[in-house]
Amino acid sequence: MCCLFGMLDYKNRFNAKQKNKIISILSVACEARGTDATGIAYNHNGHLSVYKRPLAAHKMRFNIPDVNLIMGHTRMTTQGNEKYNFNNHPFYCEIGNTEFALAHNGVLYNDITLRKTEKLPETIIETDSYIAVQLIEKQKRLDFSSLGYMAERLSGSFTITVMDNDNNLYFVKGDNPMCIYHFKEVGIFIYASTEEILKKALWRIPYRFGKPKKIELEAGDILKIDRHGKMEKSEFDTSLLSAVSYYSHFPYRHISISTEHKTKSPYQQEYIRQLKSHASFYGYTDDMVDMLLDEGYTTDDIEEMLYCGVY
């Protein structure tokens, strides 16, 4: 249960101070989906910079220069201790003259298998998410083709954002949520993992952007937004994604709905325990959460119910 967030100010309407304010408010709103670590990526002085710490967003002190694109992530740890900062998002990589950063929301369970079958190098990074970086790196380029190659090999739940050192921003949409607003009047894209989080952040931001257009993405879509705000789409095959059962956030394994309660791993048990604890703040009992799981709802579905107040 992590959160992706960010903004692209392609008309450069806002100054550095205003962008720091926007990102600070947006990242704090994203704490609803993770407080173990926070990170951002941006381009400055011809170099892609990543700033991340094992801190909740409200404890971060951003000092972002006057840049156009900022990509962020708040983390709830499932695999890889957040105290080791290399496990936190975004992840940095270089392919020739291309620098890129990647952030992932979801849980992948075939990272160990992929590292063997794809003959990828071992790494000190412990998170399942990092396999996505390595799959792109193996293709020796960053484009629709390499992103599709990566996405079609991942088994689990995901939505992924990637930015490069030319201020191109990519969204790779799996089965996890993503909400993107385009404020064409002022020339800005703002996004977060859920519409509820994005709306709450926008309500708190002391600047008016005009009326947004929501950019619709389906599972299997890859969206590219370039530095000028131009959008381009591609697709990837979701057969592997849909072949696994839809328990979005259970670490390491996805298992069928009919057997889930009988075969929970310790990691799954801990995640459900945390979900129930969080649900109690909204007035939902443990029995209600169990009932929803028995009926086939995913943990992601239940999270959306909590944040959107529908049940």
Segments (PLM) and residue ranges:
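Conserved short alpha-helical segments that host acidic/polar catalytic motifs at enzyme active sites
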Residues: 1-311
